[in-house]
Amino acid sequence: NVIYFTNKCNLACTYCYEDLPGRPPQIMTKQDIRNSVDSVLEREDPNSQTLFCLFGGEPTLEWDNVEYCMLYAYSKKRNVHFNMTTNGIKFLSKKFLKQVMDNPFYKSKLLSIDISFDGVGNQDRIYHDGKASTPSMIKVLKAVASAGLRWRLRYTIQAGNINHWYDDISKLGKTFNPSRIITSVAWTTLEADDDKLKLAQGKDLFRKDWINKAIDVPICELFCDMCSGCGERKELKTYYSDEGNVTTYGNYENSPTFHDFKEKENINE
């Protein structure tokens, strides 16, 4: 149940389909939010948990609307929870980070914050002035990890990083808890047979690394498990723990942070 708050963003990633040049800004009104929430709740089982994905563009740019959506949904149904997909830039603001951390409603209802980060040194993820965002993103990840937020790093494999996605995830897994790294594949950007071959080769490298216990990165068939509408969604997925154990989980929207991995938020400077 995805709520798109805006197509605006504080980054200008070259591969993004939302914030295209000449495309007018689009922002949900309060009425739009109520209509969207009501539409979801009308078709949901009143006795089951309802999950909303807070999305954009960049949803934190419309935080008042995000907050309104969460409170409105909660006023209609107590058994609701949320996850948010964000580039995380706004969490560099200590004031905003504190605002989220100090609110017990957010802490209980915001199950996960998925921070998109598609490459170490990726020049396709830039600010509007052309400046690279990677230095900021490393600070974002350290800030949310230190603050104790429930977060995951969402890496989308696409044409811009297909040549180095394996190296990226390996490096990130050595700095941050690898159980927090999830991956998805933007298949529409990987049209060339060579790109598909590189994807397959990267998967094989990870499997071999696991056999040799050379790295510490979980493998989830390399697909994101967040969106129920995803064409690659499967009922069960296999996760490899940092001890070499294999566990199969049911795949459902907004799956929680993988609980069987060691929590080791060792942030290397």
Model-flagged regions — what are they?
Residues L11-Y15, G121-D124, A192-D193:
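Short acidic/His/Gly/Ser-rich catalytic and metal-binding motifs that mark active-site loops
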Residues R23, K264-N266:
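Short, contiguous acidic/charged loop-to-helix segments that flank catalytic cores in large enzymes
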Residues R34-C53, E62-T188:
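Radical SAM/AdoMet-radical enzyme domain recognition
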Residues G56-E58:
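Active-site neighborhood of divalent metal-dependent phosphoester/pyrophosphate hydrolases
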Residues N65, N251-N254:
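Residue-level structural signal for beta-strand termini and adjacent loop
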Residues E269:
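Cysteine/selenocysteine-centered motifs that mediate thiol-based redox chemistry or coordinate metal-sulfur cofactors
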